[in-house]
Amino acid sequence: MRSAKLKFEKRRSRIRHKISKTSHSVRLSIFKSGRHIYAQIIDDSKSITIAAASTLDEKIKKLKKSHCNIENAIKVGEEIAKKADSAGIQDVVFDRGGYKYHGVVKALADAAREKIKF
């Protein structure tokens, strides 16, 4: 039987492979730790990070002690959308990074969808 970590890694690699086959070269990547949530807009053709936001940003960090929750995920989504808009990015591919599209991942995606299209 596969361990949970191995299942997660397989799911992550399957998602990344599907994304790499698309014509879009810019993706919105999500990472969750036990305490924080991170979002990056990455240009895979140039291998650079265009914009990044997380619960470690000073604006969001002041709000609550527990940082990886839906309220802060919405704030991170709004912040990454603002940074993408200022960088001139309108269209991205959403990379959920192996996480289920539920809870904080869904909240971040819905908040980011207000300004960027994916």
UniProtKB/Swiss-Prot annotation:
Organism whose genome encodes this protein: Rickettsia peacockii (strain Rustic)
Listed GO MF terms: 5S rRNA binding; structural constituent of ribosome
Pfam families: Ribosomal_L18p
Annotated protein name in UniProt: Large ribosomal subunit protein uL18
Keywords, ordered alphabetically: Ribonucleoprotein, Ribosomal protein, RNA-binding, rRNA-binding
Iron as UniProt keyword: no
InterPro entries referenced in this protein's UniProt entry, alphabetically: Ribosomal_uL18_bac-type (IPR004389), Ribosomal_uL18_bac/euk (IPR005484)
Family: Belongs to the universal ribosomal protein uL18 family.
Biological processes, Gene Ontology terms: translation
GO CC, any one term: cytosolic large ribosomal subunit
Highest rank taxon of the organism: Bacteria
Gene that produces this protein: rplR
Physiological role: This is one of the proteins that bind and probably mediate the attachment of the 5S RNA into the large ribosomal subunit, where it forms part of the central protuberance.
Record text on subunit structure and interactions: Part of the 50S ribosomal subunit; part of the 5S rRNA/L5/L18/L25 subcomplex. Contacts the 5S and 23S rRNAs.
SUPFAM superfamilies tied to this protein: Translational machinery components
